[in-house]
Amino acid sequence: MIDNGGRFFAMKHGRKIHRLSRPADQRRALLRGLTTQLLKHGRIKTTRAKASAMRKYVDKMITLAKEGSLHKRRQALGFIYEKQIVHALFAEVPERYGDRNGGYTRIIRTLPRRGDNAPMAYIELV
């Protein structure tokens, strides 16, 4: 056993989470904001880590909109910051993504950011 000051840390096999160097509440707020902006504009530029972390939540919101029940709409309203985006999402998504089972976003790598050389990417709705 490894001596690490009396604390034992078990390995987290298969439980990958993108921490993004933030506490849980700030990370959730960041991902909610990025998801809202992507659904509003259709395409945003962000770091690759943030893009891959938010992809899960965007796909979840689109899946909720495809199901379209009142319960799913209220779940989406609890996550997306702007009410108008939720209404537009639930009106537009069933005919746009009706035959697609997942994979609603595309990540396009681009040049690193000039100031700190962070890897950047565009994330867009397919």
UniProtKB/Swiss-Prot annotation:
GO term, biological process aspect, one: translation
Transit peptide: 1-10
UniProt keyword terms in alphabetical order: Chloroplast, Plastid, Ribonucleoprotein, Ribosomal protein, RNA-binding, rRNA-binding, Transit peptide
Localization of this protein: Plastid, Chloroplast
NCBIfam families: L17
Subunit structure: Component of the chloroplast large ribosomal subunit (LSU). Mature 70S chloroplast ribosomes of higher plants consist of a small (30S) and a large (50S) subunit. The 30S small subunit contains 1 molecule of ribosomal RNA (16S rRNA) and 24 different proteins. The 50S large subunit contains 3 rRNA molecules (23S, 5S and 4.5S rRNA) and 33 different proteins.
Function, in words: Component of the chloroplast ribosome (chloro-ribosome), a dedicated translation machinery responsible for the synthesis of chloroplast genome-encoded proteins, including proteins of the transcription and translation machinery and components of the photosynthetic apparatus.
Protein family per UniProt: Belongs to the bacterial ribosomal protein bL17 family.
Protein name according to UniProt: Large ribosomal subunit protein bL17c
Organism (species): Spinacia oleracea
Source taxonomy: Eukaryota, Viridiplantae, Streptophyta, Embryophyta, Tracheophyta
Gene that encodes it: RPL17
